[in-house]
UniProtKB/Swiss-Prot annotation:
Keywords assigned by UniProt, alphabetized: Chromosome partition, DNA-binding
UniProt key word DNA-binding: yes
Protein name per the record: Probable chromosome-partitioning protein ParB
GO biological process: one example: chromosome segregation
Pfam families recorded: HTH_ParB, ParB_dimer, ParBc
Molecular function (Gene Ontology), one example: DNA binding
Job of this protein: Involved in chromosome partition. Localize to both poles of the predivisional cell following completion of DNA replication. Binds to the DNA origin of replication.
A Gene Ontology term for the protein's cellular component: chromosome
PANTHER family noted in UniProt: CHROMOSOME-PARTITIONING PROTEIN PARB-RELATED
Protein family according to the UniProt entry: Belongs to the ParB family.
Lineage of source species: Bacteria, Pseudomonadati, Pseudomonadota, Alphaproteobacteria, Rickettsiales
Length: 286
């Protein structure tokens, strides 16, 4: 049988042609409750609609492709199918048991999942990081094993250096990979990210924003009206005024109020303890 090019060279080279053709493998029927997912697999989010669609297909046609597990029944390949079978309330499923130790099983499971096309950028980046840190992979070795370019792997590995809040924005498609790359190791990455999102900047504008920051053009003139040139840092000159305003607002609303001020904007935060306090705030605002 012809090899499926979508798998790349990694999984097929590790597991052999059994990944593509299972004719020579012994398929066993196992109670689904004995099977467990791999906790180290990079995919963290499974879309319910897609799992439900697969579950409906399994109910109508059965599970056409066995799940691959290790000696401890930990999934190496096929977690989506396993989840769909659970959803469809299938009691027993076909599996192929691979004679692998825990380390080999984990490595192959990671590679199999990373090679999928529907991982998010951050899921792929975290998978690369795990392989580098736990299996001594280099960028070159990963590129060869996964059939990806070294630059792609290097760029994604660097995304792991971003603050968690920005990684989450990338994962949720609020920020693109190109925008996020501009903020790696930036002192005020989170503030910059908020500005990029609120002003709907594209990648080129984001690159220019960061370039201007590092050129320190934002300090040349206190009256600089260029959006790219404005300061992001807190304006200490207004601290006294803000403290007075915080005091007035706290007394007026009877709760803790804080203000985070930046030259490009800021946040006015009301800290309420329960819904009754929230209702009072809304009543006074109206």
């Amino acid at each position: 049988m012809a090899k499926n090019k979508g798998l790349g060279r990694g999984l097929s080279s590790l597991l052999g042609e059994e990944v593509i053709s299972i004719e020579s493998e012994i398929i066993q029927i196992i109670n689904i409750d004995k099977i467990r997912p791999n906790e180290n697999q990079p995919r963290k989010n499974f879309e319910y609609d897609k799992i439900k669609e697969l579950a409906d297909s399994i109910l109508n046609n059965g599970l056409l492709q066995p799940i691959i597990v290790d000696n401890n029944f930990q999934i190496i390949a096929g977690e989506r199918r396993w989840r769909a079978c659970k959803l469809a309330k299938v009691l027993e499923i076909p599996v192929i048991i691979k004679n692998l130790d825990a380390r080999e099983s984990m490595e192959i499971a990671l590679i199999e999942n990373i090679q999928r096309t529907d991982l998010t950028v951050m899921e792929e980046a975290r998978g690369f990081k795990y392989l580098v840190e736990n299996f001594n992979y280099t960028t070159e070795k990963l590129a060869e094993r996964l059939g990806k370019s070294r630059s792609h792997i290097a760029n994604l590995l660097r995304l792991n250096n971003l603050p968690q809040s920005i990684q989450d924005k990338v994962n949720e498609n609020i920020l693109s990979m190109g925008q996020a790359r501009c903020l790696i190791n930036h002192e005020h990455a989170e503030v910059m990210a908020d500005h990029i999102i609120s002003n709907d900047l594209n990648v080129r504008q984001t690159e220019e924003l960061v370039r201007q920051w590092y050129k320190n053009e934002y300090t040349k003139s206190p009256n600089n009206n260029n959006k790219v040139g404005k300061r992001f840092l807190k304006d200490n000159a207004t601290d006294n005024d803000l403290e007075s305003l915080v005091k007035v607002l706290s007394e007026k609303f009877g709760i803790k109020v804080t203000i985070e001020n930046y030259s490009l904007g800021g946040k006015l935060i009301f800290h309420y303890k329960n819904l009754e306090e929230l209702d009072l705030i809304l009543l006074k605002l109206n």
